[in-house]
Design a protein with these regions (language model features):
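A short, surface-exposed alpha-helical micro-motif characterized by mixed small hydrophobic
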Residues: 220-222
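Helix-to-loop junction immediately C-terminal to a conserved catalytic motif
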Residues: 64
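Conserved ABC transporter NBD signature motif
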Residues: 72-82, 90
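Conserved ABC ATPase "signature" region
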Residues: 120, 130-148, 257-258
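Conserved ABC ATPase signature
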Residues: 153-157, 161
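Conserved catalytic motifs of ABC-family nucleotide-binding domains
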Residues: 174
Length: 270
């Protein structure tokens, strides 16, 4: 396997079986994900786009080990992705930034406790109050927040500040792959631009890879290195970003392009 590949997905499927009625003898099958294969390279922003229900969220859950796959394989840096293997400690290496900064933080805990907790659990720092506060303050500084934020509760922060806290919490265990699940859809435009700039800077600084899950092609155009288009649980097309926007190969990709109200084909400063 190419050493430049951080994540490899091969023939990944997730099927759900159900009965339509109480009198059905045979179960029906919903193919939420059906034979998906792709690779994510080191230090790459790999965008996964598609309409609601195309399988984007199911894909992220499978990568994170939050649901069992029906078939297929997932490899992280050439090794089978097995979250039960404590020696490999994959949970520390793969993190997710959730869509909603309002519900992803515990309203009853101070910020420093939430940021430092993963580091304590993974043996990065000791479970001492001073160590936890100092560690959280350092992480907050890395995402553009003041040290005093460490003693705040989530309700005391704006949406943009909460999302920055979410980023700091993800980075506290020094991940190599970060899944961004619609990271700015709950934020206004100006704050979204700040968060996206921050994520880009952190990628360049830390050498991480991103799987950027979104339905917004404008953001994909400005941020992603490659684009993966999904529909009905399958991959329709994978292409370099510029190639995708200049000449989409699949009819569904062209439909997505046409559905955009407007798009700038230059890369403005966000």
């Amino acid at each position: 396997m190419d050493e430049n590949v951080i994540l490899s997905v091969s023939g990944l499927s997730k099927h759900y079986k159900y009965y339509k009625t109480l009198f059905d003898i045979k179960k029906n099958v919903i193919k939420a994900l059906d034979g998906v294969s792709f690779e994510v390279f080191k230090n790459e922003i790999f965008a996964v786009v598609g309409e609601t229900g195309c399988g984007k969220s199911t894909l992220s859950k499978l990568i994170l080990g939050l649901t069992e796959k029906t078939s297929g394989e997932i490899y992280f840096k050439g090794e089978p992705l097995d979250y039960g293997n404590k020696k490999k400690d994959f949970r520390k290496k793969i993190q997710i930034l959730f869509q909603d900064p309002y519900s992803s933080l515990n309203p009853k805990k101070k910020i420093y406790k939430m940021i430092s907790y993963p580091a304590v659990k993974n043996g990065i720092i000791k479970n001492k109050k001073k160590d936890r506060i100092d560690f959280a303050a350092e992480q907050l500084e890395n995402v553009g927040l003041s040290e005093s934020t460490a003693f705040s509760y989530p309700h005391m922060l704006s949406g943009g500040q909460r999302q920055r806290v979410g980023i700091a919490r993800c980075l506290s265990v020094r991940p190599e792959l970060l899944i961004l699940d619609e990271p700015v859809s709950a934020l206004d435009v100006s704050i979204s631009a700040q968060i996206l700039n921050l994520l880009t800077d952190l990628r360049n600084k830390n050498g991480m890879s991103y799987i950027f899950i979104t339905h917004d092609l404008k953001l994909v155009r400005h941020l992603a290195d490659r684009v993966c288009v999904m529909y009905g649980g399958k991959i329709m097309e994978i292409a370099e970003t510029d190639d995708f926007f200049n000449a989409p190969a699949h009819p569904y990709s062209k439909t997505l392009m046409e559905s955009m109200e407007s798009i700038s084909f230059t890369r403005p400063n966000l």
